[in-house]
Design a protein with these regions (language model features):
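Surface-exposed amphipathic alpha-helical segments
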Residues: 1, 105-134
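Secretory pathway targeting signatures of secreted, lumenal, and periplasmic proteins
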Residues: 2-49
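Short, flexible beta-strand-to-coil junctions
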Residues: 11-12, 23-27, 82-85, 112-118
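Glycine-rich, often proline-containing surface loops adjacent to acidic residues and nearby aromatics
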Residues: 16-19, 75-78, 105-111
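A short, polar/proline- and glycine-enriched secondary-structure boundary/capping micro-motif
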Residues: 17-19, 29-32, 89-90, 119-124
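Short, low-complexity, polar/charged sequence segments that are solvent-exposed and flexible
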Residues: 26-27, 38-42, 97-101, 128-132
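Signature of long, low-cysteine stretches enriched in small and polar/charged residues
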Residues: 47-104
Length: 134
């Protein structure tokens, strides 16, 4: 669709995934913690899990951490947390970066996640975070 892009890179024992999504900006409330989490879950549900009817969502066990910052004059929100698969046993860390494009009045989010059940995830997460910094 026009508002969602998902791709992933598969390793033998791990997976890195990327979502880029956008939606209309409706004022400051569009960047609230509740709105960002709701948007993430709405778009993450489009990523199918391994079993029928399963899909990605944000873990309810740990509350995501939010950080507001400015980069080159633009306001951003970083959200870090853990994702799960509703209806299956998968999960891992994620980080997302959200900003508003004032020219189009749209919110844009780059969301990166890692699945690596047997290996440490730190280096995989650093790689996906680097995609934002480049």
């Amino acid at each position: 669709s026009d508002d969602f892009l998902w791709f992933r890179y598969e390793f033998p024992a791990a997976s890195q995934g990327f979502m880029l999504y956008s939606y209309p900006y409706e004022g400051k409330q569009s960047l609230s913690e509740e709105a960002l989490l709701a948007a993430r879950n709405r778009f993450a549900a489009r990523i199918p899990g391994p079993s029928d009817g399963s899909y990605m969502t944000t873990s309810k066990v740990f509350t995501p951490r939010y950080r507001f910052f400015r980069l080159e004059g633009r306001a951003w929100v970083e959200m870090r947390g853990f994702w799960d698969v509703e209806g299956d046993f998968m999960g891992g860390p994620f980080v997302s970066y959200t900003t508003v494009d004032t020219a189009t009045d749209r919110v844009f989010t780059l969301d990166c996640y890692v699945y690596s059940p047997k290996l440490p995830k730190r280096n995989y997460m650093r790689e996906v975070e680097h995609c934002f910094i480049w």
